[in-house]
Every structure is written in structure tokens, then in C-alpha cells.
């Protein structure tokens, strides 16, 4: 079973804790230079080893799917940004009691990746990658928490994240992918 959480990020996390969710996935897409092309998962500075391993697996699977690189931090966990990138993303997960990752599988500023994201087949593939990662790391099942990055914050209700090359916004496509992943997990 999957439940979507909204509100400010700390409220989402605390609500998922109260609901005893088994895991928490917040979906974003990255934006930077148009040539940027790596997949990554952010985990909080206080992340469990399960969060780190889940994030590493997800980032590697997303990179393989998209034919891109894996984020290579100066750590022992390829694909994982422990504590976020310069702290960005850490607060999005810091208050969870369960394993939690923030997904950044591609760059919406990269024209090729933005075009892929707009195609249903790529959305389906990203959703399957996320669903597969959850089934792999949480085989006993339970309530899964999904958070659509940027969307639904009470502190900034119009925030929809980065503009996508060629039109659209990050939160629109994060929501599409998460809804497709939820459908897969609830089968």
C-alpha cells in the first residue's frame, strides 16, 4: 500500500512516522548545466545503512536505465549524496524514522533527458525502477510513503521545482512517475 504525503517537508516526514511507514521516497529531478548527466539519491546525514544501500541501488539502476553516469561523491557509496549536496535535500529526509531516499534520477535541464522524461515509456521505466527497489529492500511489504518534491508545501504552495527543458515543471513529472510506481506496488 502507498500513501502520498504533502505539506512542508518535516510535516510529511512526521506524518509518515506516525503512520509507521516502512520506507519514504521523495521524488525530484535535478537541474544544472544542460550537459549534466548522472543519477543520484540523497540520504539524510543521519541515514541508516539500509537507506544508503537502497539509494545506491536505485541510483545505479536509474543510471543503467538512462545510459548515464552514477553520481560519484568522495565517499564509499557511489550514487549517494549523504546529507545532500551542500546540505540540499538533507532536511527533506532528516526527520524520518524509516529508511528514506530523495530521488534525482536525471537532469531536466539536459535536453535529451528532458525529452526522455516526457515519454510514457521512460516514465513507466522510472516507475518500475523505483517499485523494484522498494520490493528488493522491503520484501515483507507494508505502507510506503511517497512525497512529490516541491509540490504541496504550505510554506510555498506555488513551488513546482525546476523548469523542464522544452516546457513543464519538475513536480508534474515527479507526480506522474510516483503515481505509476504506486500502481505497480499496489498490484
Give the predicted meaning of each segment.
Residues 1-187:
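Active-site-proximal helix/loop segments of hydrolytic enzymes
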Amino acid at each position: 500500500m502507498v500513501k502520498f504525503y504533502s505539506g512542508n517537508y518535516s510535516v510529511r516526514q512526521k506524518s509518515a512516522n506516525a503512520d509507521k511507514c516502512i520506507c519514504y521516497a521523495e521524488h525530484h529531478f535535478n537541474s544544472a548545466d544542460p550537459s549534466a548527466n548522472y543519477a543520484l539519491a540523497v540520504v539524510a546525514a543521519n541515514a541508516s545503512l539500509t537507506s544508503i544501500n537502497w539509494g545506491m541501488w536505485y541510483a545505479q539502476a536509474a543510471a543503467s536505465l538512462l545510459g548515464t553516469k552514477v553520481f560519484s561523491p568522495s565517499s564509499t557509496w557511489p550514487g549517494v549524496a549523504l546529507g545532500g549536496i551542500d546540505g540540499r535535500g538533507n532536511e527533506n529526509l532528516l526527520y524520518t524514522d524509516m529508511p528514506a531516499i530523495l530521488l534525482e534520477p536525471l537532469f531536466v535541464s539536459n535536453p535529451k533527458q528532458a525529452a526522455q522524461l516526457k515519454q510514457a515509456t521512460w516514465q513507466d521505466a522510472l516507475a518500475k525502477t523505483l517499485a523494484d527497489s522498494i520490493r528488493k529492500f522491503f520484501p515483507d511489504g507494508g505502507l510506503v510513503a511517497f512525497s512529490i518534491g516541491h509540490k504541496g508545501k504550505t510554506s510555498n504552495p506555488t513551488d513546482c521545482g525546476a523548469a523542464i527543458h522544452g516546457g513543464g515543471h519538475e513536480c508534474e513529472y515527479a507526480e506522474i512517475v510516483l503515481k505509476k510506481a504506486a500502481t505497480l506496488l499496489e498490484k
